[in-house]
A protein has these predicted regions:
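Long, position-biased, composition-driven segments near the start of the mature protein
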Residues: 1-373
Length: 373
């Protein structure tokens, strides 16, 4: 913090003056947080009926008609075939179920098998999903970035790509996207386990009887990026949350402790005393204490090597030749091709990154001879 009113949640961030920010302050909750519904931090309305969750994670109202329809779809005609089990769910079980939902088409079955000590067979399903990778079309291609591909002519496979910091930032930005935003970009068709069914379930549940509000429904279907997480050359349109302003307080005692609280209409009413002044959050990607968005994750100017499996490393002549040696690819078999990456290619890269280990080859479709020529 300094006289220009900035703060950061990250260590070693630099102020406008060029010095590292080193004054510590305690972050407090907003004073009007008590006005929120206590104990109701979820998305569903309290007192709603029970829900029915199928093995492929379709969430439905717990109605008899839905239950009978599910049994009919599963070709279960005799109720004597069914038995009930009670399961205790803790943090470990939740992590297992999350992983199963991303990799398996039957995550509840896999989850129960794992609980019973069975081996993990989900990698087979992941490979099957990668084989069915299709292409996603974008609505516009307003921006493009160049990418040089190094291709094995005999294998019709991308060995690696040579890129600038813009393409590296694009790939790294995939790690910042909320899962709901990824599914929205892909039209709810990610092929990723059963999360498409979860996404569709939220779409189908009404705010009249089940979800608390349209705002919360939209939060699930189209969540925003955290403040300052968007890149300057963003090809995919995921909205970024705005960063709130904060208010600085001092306890006025000899030890002079500082406190920070989100700025609200009631922030000046505090047991800490009157607020000393507003503060704005620093963009952690800025080296000069800027509070506006933008910027990237990697330093430039720089060149990067991106493998077919999306491993990003610093490019050098030695590293590229060594990589070709590891792949046992003769230099005479290597061809170069410059391609353009726009919104459509970025969407397909995002999808391939989720389900394929040959993302560059899959996206740039080397069966198209125009790429190989």
């Amino acid at each position: 913090m300094d006289g220009r009113g900035i703060l950061s949640e990250f260590a070693n961030v630099r102020c406008h003056c060029g010095q590292v920010m080193n004054q510590l302050a305690t972050m407090l909750e907003p004073v009007d947080a008590a006005s929120c519904d206590q104990g109701e931090g979820g998305f569903l309305k309290g007192g709603a009926d029970r829900f029915l969750v199928s093995d492929d994670l379709r969430v439905m109202p717990g109605l008899s008609s839905q239950c009978l329809m599910l049994l009919k779809n599963l070709s279960i005609m005799d109720a004597k075939e069914l038995e009930s089990q009670s399961m205790n769910i803790g943090p470990e079980e939740i992590l297992q179920l999350l992983r199963s939902s991303l990799l398996s088409k039957t995550p509840l079955t896999h989850w129960i098998w794992l609980k019973q000590g069975a081996s993990d067979l989900m990698e087979l399903e992941l490979n099957n999903m990668a084989e069915s990778l299709d292409k996603t079309s974008a609505t516009s291609d307003s921006k493009k970035m160049s990418l040089k591909l190094f291709i094995s002519k005999s294998r019709e496979q991308v060995l690696y790509a040579e890129s600038g910091e813009d393409f590296a930032d694009l790939l790294f930005s995939f790690l910042t996207f909320p899962l709901g935003s990824i599914l929205k970009l892909l039209g709810g068709k990610s092929l990723l386990g059963c999360v498409d069914n979860l996404y569709g379930s939220v779409k189908d549940l009404s705010t009249d009887n089940y979800l608390k509000s349209d705002e919360l429904k939209n939060m699930l279907l189209c969540p925003k990026l955290a403040p300052f997480f968007a890149c300057e050359n963003q090809l995919l349109h995921v909205e970024e949350s705005s960063s709130p302003q904060y208010l600085l307080y001092s306890n006025g005692k000899p030890n002079n402790k500082w406190f920070v609280r989100p700025l609200t209409t009631e922030s000046n009413v505090s047991s800490l005393g009157e607020g000393l002044g507003p503060l704005s959050m620093v963009n952690p990607k800025s080296s000069t204490g800027e509070t506006t968005g933008g910027g990237g994750y990697v330093k430039g100017p720089a060149k990067f090597m991106v493998t077919d499996a999306l491993v990003v490393t610093q490019l050098s002549p030695i590293s590229s030749i060594s990589f070709l040696g590891k792949l046992d690819v003769p230099i005479t078999d290597v061809d170069e091709k410059v391609v353009q990456v726009g919104e459509e290619e970025a969407l397909n890269l995002l999808k391939a990154a989720l389900i394929s280990e040959t993302a560059l080859t899959d996206v740039f479709n080397l069966t198209d001879k125009s790429v190989l020529e």
